Amino acid sequence: TPVKRGPGSPKPKPPTATPPPSLPPGRIYAEPTFVPLLPGQLTTGEVNQYDAYASILQPIPPPRKGANMVMQLTDVLGQAAVDAITQSGKIVFHSVGDTGADKQNRVADEADVAGMMAKDLAITIPAEKPAFFYHLGDVVYEFGQADSYYGQFYEPFCLYNAPIFAIPGNHDGMIWAPSMQTLQAFQANFCTPAPVHATNAGSLMRTTMDQPGVYFTLEAPFVTIIGLYSNVVDKGPGIISSENNPKYKSIVSDDQKNWLISELKRLAPIRKQNKTAVVLAVHHPPFTGSGTQNTLGADLDDAFTKGGLWPDLILSGHAHLYERFERDVNGIKLPYIIAGCGGYNLSPYAKASDPTVKVPPSMANDPSLQAYMKTFGYMKIKATATQLAVVFNSIDVSYGIAADSIVIDLQTHAVTEGKRGREPL
């Protein structure tokens, strides 16, 4: 019979196994005292594998042979659905990263995030209904295993009746044995030549996504999303190219960065004519506050400069919380948003946040930090011909819907913070 504890009652002690009278030599059955894993804690075996491979760069798989690197939303939703979005004057889509709940004590958080996103799809007005989910990486943990996709991706999102695009995170690309091939399972689920039933989905019906590769462009009405792969390094900045570093050149080619520069050159005149907003998505955060500069950020800055176009918004995951920064670039405010709060676990060593304020007083000395929330949730991103908006919704009622939001004017680049609890645009 369950025993109810009052607020002042001591916490129950971990269960202790009853010792058997005797055991044959070499046999052990029960833990003397069971100590459950903390959120984010790895088993001993996982720690050994993690430490061995978490900093070993992997080659970036080339795009699928003959594939067009620019993916059209019409090829996925169909012309009629995209025409309806265009005629409505607005597109809405979901985005968040780091969803894969790999242990039982984390499943509920991912399920709650996925459930709230699925409920958004019940909206029938084309201008308000999310058209797709753009995943910011770390679909599964810890080592990109194919057998993790059912429990960490397909089942949690089984009620999400819309396309899901994704860029890989470091855990999607990590391996735990030299015989493994990096990103093999990710490509089998997101980069197939055509949509087919996903083997890893088991009896569930979702088909694979036919992205051209692990980096690509997605073109949709009012918005173009450039997605990059930032490799497997966990503790430290991501890497999209060799960065002219001799020790990287034998492993990581410059193909992705060269493609990015050419893609920015292609989009620059289109953006200048105000025909599309440009969003860049990369798993590792390239900017984490005033006075900081990492090599990934420097590499991207170089590409933006050479390509002649700076994105209107930069999205990333990796850090398991929600943060919004504004960086001064060429006289404008450029928003960098970290949203790695999709369900895996909240960063155990990050400072606590306060639902009553956007930025805790202890962090207010960084003028670039505009919002800091250590809570699970997801983003709704909206684009029109003249504006781009980001809305962060938390599954925690103390933060709630539209816990943070901004509207970007695509002509003046002005960034306006929205009112709490009210979705802009």
Describe each model-derived feature in a short phrase.
Residues 1-131, 150, 154-166, 179-184, ...:
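Acidic, histidine-bearing metal-coordination/catalytic regions of metal-dependent phosphoesterases
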Residues 34-39, 47, 52-81, 147-272, ...:
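Extended active-site neighborhood of metal-dependent phosphoesterases/phosphodiesterases
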Residues 95-97, 131-138, 142, 164-170, ...:
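Active-site neighborhood of phospho(di)ester-bond hydrolases with catalytic His/Asp-centered motifs
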Residues 99-101, 140, 171-173, 231-234, ...:
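Short, solvent-exposed loop/turn segments at secondary-structure junctions
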Residues 99-102, 137-146, 231, 243-253, ...:
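The substrate-binding groove and active-site-proximal loops of carbohydrate-active enzymes
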Residues 105-109, 125, 248-255, 292, ...:
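Extracytoplasmic/periplasmic, Sec-exported soluble proteins
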Residues 267-289:
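Short acidic, glycine-rich surface-loop motifs adjacent to enzyme active sites
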Residues 287-295, 330:
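Catalytic lumenal/periplasmic loop and adjoining terminal transmembrane helix
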